[in-house]
């Protein structure tokens, strides 16, 4: 079983290393990290390359999260750890996305893949926190605010709904919430100071 856990961890982590924004911009003979905020994430990509091309980024980042959770679940389900397997895959793919060894440990902030793993762990809660993101974004125009509120609430809602059903997925949910909020610490500081930049997620971008 130890080897199975190690295999699940490695698969999920290295899937997380495949950063959609970096890959798609590389296909365009460019690097999203050399533009704007320098972040390898969806928001910076949209600002500079547009919403149309961002669909490929979304497909990659959501796809890798789904694959990681499913692979981990399938590997560990023979041992009776189906839900724990999904949670392990969720944790490792987000760690791979935010701290990718193949990209010098400089990845994205994990919100897109984070919403996806939330859906994989519990689709009802995933949809709810995605709704929180949408409401916050459309009311304020701040992607970061929606990201912090939605990701920050996931772990606590998951713990409340699934309390008593197993500690590992609950711990993973709380860890993911804390990690993604921490990845947005600079955004939180700018929000408090009134310096955060609003983002049009339907923008055509600045680079043609």
Please state what every model-predicted region is.
Residues 1-7, 69-88, 119-125, 159-172:
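Helix-coil boundary and interhelical linker segments in multi-pass alpha-helical membrane proteins
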Residues 4, 8, 12, 17, ...:
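Alpha-helical transmembrane segments in multi-pass membrane proteins
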Residues 21-25, 96-106, 133-140, 185-189:
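C-terminal ends of transmembrane helices
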Residues 22-54, 189-208:
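Cytosolic, membrane-interface loops and tails of multi-pass inner-membrane proteins
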Residues 44-51, 72-75, 92, 96, ...:
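Interfacial segments of multi-pass membrane proteins
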Residues 105-109, 130-134, 167-173, 190-196:
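A cytosolic-side transmembrane-helix exit/cap motif
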Residues 127, 143-150, 165-176:
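Loop-to-transmembrane alpha-helix initiation sites
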């Amino acid at each position: 079983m130890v080897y199975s856990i190690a295999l699940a961890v490695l698969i999920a982590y290295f899937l997380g290393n495949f950063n959609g924004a970096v890959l798609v911009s590389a296909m365009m003979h460019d690097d999203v990290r050399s533009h704007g905020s320098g972040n390898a994430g969806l928001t910076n990509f949209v600002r500079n390359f547009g919403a149309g091309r961002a669909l490929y980024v979304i497909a990659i980042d959501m796809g890798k999260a789904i694959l990681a959770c499913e692979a981990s679940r399938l590997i560990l389900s023979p041992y009776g750890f189906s839900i724990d397997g999904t949670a392990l895959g969720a944790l490792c793919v987000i760690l791979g996305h935010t701290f990718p060894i193949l990209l010098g440990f400089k990845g994205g902030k994990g919100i897109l893949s984070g919403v996806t793993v939330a859906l994989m762990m519990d689709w009802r809660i995933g949809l709810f926190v995605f709704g929180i993101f949408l409401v916050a974004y459309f009311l304020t125009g701040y992607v970061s605010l929606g990201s912090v509120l939605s990701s920050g609430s996931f772990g606590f809602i998951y713990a409340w709904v699934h309390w008593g059903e197993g500690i590992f997925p609950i711990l993973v949910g709380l860890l993911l919430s804390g990690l993604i909020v921490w990845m947005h610490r600079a955004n939180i500081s700018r929000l408090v100071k009134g310096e955060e930049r609003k983002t049009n997620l339907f923008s055509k971008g600045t680079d043609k």
